[in-house]
Amino acid sequence: MATPAQRLHLLPLLLLLCGECAQVCGCNETGMLERLPRCGKAFAEMMQKVDVWKWCNLSEFIVYYESFTNCTEMETNIVGCYWPNPLAQSFITGIHRQFFSNCTVDRTHWEDPPDEVLIPLIAVPVLLTVAMAGLVVWRSKRTDRLL
């Protein structure tokens, strides 16, 4: 019988073979769709600890969301799928709809500055560009005469 130290040497080989099996066998999408709801259920249970009116404040639940993300990644990798993939993304989008559909982003309404400010901001660079181009042309003509 092998000692624990001898079994420990077999661990990298076992991990290598298991990892290769998932890649060789391909993505088990059915298994992934069966496993991902576990992550969603765990996330829902964690989100119950957060007041509903704080669900739009990422700093209130970022640890739970990280755990959810890690769970979905681990579950997809276990069944031999890459992460992210379209099925996992659609599952995550469903979770977003369930918890964050009422979160809206307040868009800033931009306005142009008053004309007294806008005209100089446009005119000064244009005039400087014309003046510099004129200076270059004048200087190049003057150099041609000296040579």
Curated annotation (Swiss-Prot):
Membrane-spanning residues: 113-137
Chief location bin: membrane
Molecular functions per Gene Ontology: adrenomedullin receptor activity; amylin receptor activity; coreceptor activity; G protein-coupled receptor binding
InterPro entries recorded: RAMP (IPR006985), RAMP_sf (IPR038126)
Subcellular location per the Swiss-Prot or TrEMBL entry: Cell membrane; Membrane
Superkingdom of the organism of origin: Eukaryota
Signal peptide boundaries: 1-22
Positions marked as site (Required for CALCRL interaction): D112, S140
A GO biological-process term: adenylate cyclase-activating G protein-coupled receptor signaling pathway
Keywords: Cell membrane, Disulfide bond, Glycoprotein, Membrane, Receptor, Signal, Transmembrane, Transmembrane helix, Transport
Keyword flag Disulfide bond: yes
Disulfide bonds: C39-C71, C56-C103
UniProt function note: Accessory protein that interacts with and modulates the function of G-protein coupled receptors including calcitonin gene-related peptide type 1 receptor (CALCRL), calcitonin receptor (CALCR) and G-protein coupled estrogen receptor 1 (GPER1). Required for the transport of CALCRL and GPER1 receptors to the plasma membrane. Plays a role in cardioprotection by reducing cardiac hypertrophy and perivascular fibrosis in a GPER1-dependent manner. Together with CALCRL, form a receptor complex for adrenomedullin/ADM and intermedin/ADM2. Together with CALCR, act as a receptor complex for amylin/IAPP.
Description of how the protein assembles with itself and partners: Heterodimer of CALCRL and RAMP3; interaction induces allosteric modulation of CALCRL function and ligand specificity for adrenomedullin/ADM and intermedin/ADM2. Heterodimer of CALCR and RAMP3; interaction form the receptor complex AMYR3 for amylin/IAPP. Interacts with GPER1.
Name of protein: Receptor activity-modifying protein 3
Gene of this entry: Ramp3
